[in-house]
Curated annotation (Swiss-Prot):
Gene3D superfamilies: Acetylglutamate kinase-like. InterPro entries: AceGlu_kinase-like_sf, AcgluKinase_fam, ArgB, Asp/Glu/Uridylate_kinase, Glu/AcGlu_kinase, NAGK-C. This is Acetylglutamate kinase. It is found in: Cytoplasm. Pathway: Amino-acid biosynthesis; L-arginine biosynthesis; N(2)-acetyl-L-ornithine from L-glutamate: step 2/4. The lineage of its organism: Bacteria, Bacillati, Bacillota, Clostridia, Eubacteriales. One of its GO terms (biological process) is L-arginine biosynthetic process. It comes from the Bacteria. It comes from Clostridium beijerinckii (strain ATCC 51743 / NCIMB 8052). It catalyses: N-acetyl-L-glutamate + ATP = N-acetyl-L-glutamyl 5-phosphate + ADP. Pfam families: AA_kinase (PF00696).
Length: 285
């Protein structure tokens, strides 16, 4: 337990970082075990509220894969994945809208309100916040889309009114006005890019990019863009890490200052990443 002096020193240590990020937009993709564990969920929400309280402008983007699968199971409708993406037929897209625009989104908003923050829940269909087109691939994915446009004014208005935007990753078709399921990492990256955010943070269930996935001491703390192709060729960046890295790279090329892949299983990982020299994830810039 910290004594009073040590607590004061922690706050003083954080001051330069608070000053650095004050007024800056930081997009947090919220997912993984941090959404499932009640304890972790509360620490993430408190981190986000604290960011807002000290003048940082957080935007929360979320998926809801486990909840979508759970509801589909209860409807006796099979979940099917193709290359890591959920095949989204007519029934599935209805469930996606209910979960991402309803249950998960509103639960996060109510939790933020419970702990003293102010939040507004949105999905990409609200005010045409997110426009998308169908992903064309060799294997038909159904109503799975890629974002073509972000209505930044909705987010800026929400922020300037003192609220934390909480965005569910479902979008409106640019041509057919139908709902499209969007990968949450991609959604967060597109929003960060459109707003030229200071930081993009992807919460996940691994510490970051590691040379040896079984050895935390091999965590790569910082990555420059030019180093990434070599790590892919060496097989260090592989599997599910590849699309996350791709999201970060795209965001940086579109004007985001830095992107971080962060272990959401670590309590207060967002604050540890933002308010210390060392950070705890893999920062890409």
């Amino acid at each position: 337990m910290l004594n009073h002096t040590e607590r004061a020193e922690v706050l003083v240590h954080a001051l330069p970082y608070i000053q650095r990020y004050r007024g800056k937009i930081i997009v947090v993709k919220y997912g993984g075990n941090a959404m499932i564990s009640n304890e972790l969920r509360e620490t993430v929400i408190n981190d986000i509220i604290l960011m807002k309280c000290v003048g940082i402008e957080p935007i929360v983007v979320h998926g809801g894969g486990p909840d979508i699968s759970d509801l589909l199971n209860r409807l006796n409708h099979k979940s099917e994945f193709i290359n890591g993406l959920r095949y989204t037929d007519d029934i599935t897209i209805e469930v996606v809208q209910m979960v991402l625009g309803g249950k998960v989104n509103k639960n996060l908003v109510s939790l933020i309100e419970k702990f003293g923050g102010k939040a507004i829940g949105l999905c990409g269909m609200d005010g045409s916040l997110l426009k998308a087109k169908k992903i064309e691939s060799d294997n038909d994915l159904g109503y799975v889309g890629e974002i073509t446009k972000v209505n930044t004014e909705i987010l800026k208005t929400t922020i300037s009114s003192g609220y934390i935007p909480v965005v569910g990753s479902v979008a409106l078709g640019e041509d057919d006005n139908k709902a499209y399921n969007i990968n949450a990492d991609t959604c967060a990256a597109k929003i960060a890019s459109a707003l030229k955010a200071e930081r993009l943070i992807l919460l996940t269930d691994v510490p970051g990019v590691m040379k040896d996935p079984k050895d935390i001491s091999t965590l790569i703390s910082t990555l420059r863009l030019h180093q990434i192709p070599k790590l892919c060729l060496e097989g260090i960046i592989k599997g599910g890490m590849i699309p996350k890295i791709d999201c970060c790279v795209e965001a940086i090329r579109m004007g985001v200052e830095k992107a971080t892949i962060l272990d959401g299983r670590v309590p207060h990982s967002i604050l540890l990443e933002l308010f210390s020299n060392e950070g705890i994830g893999t920062m890409i810039y």
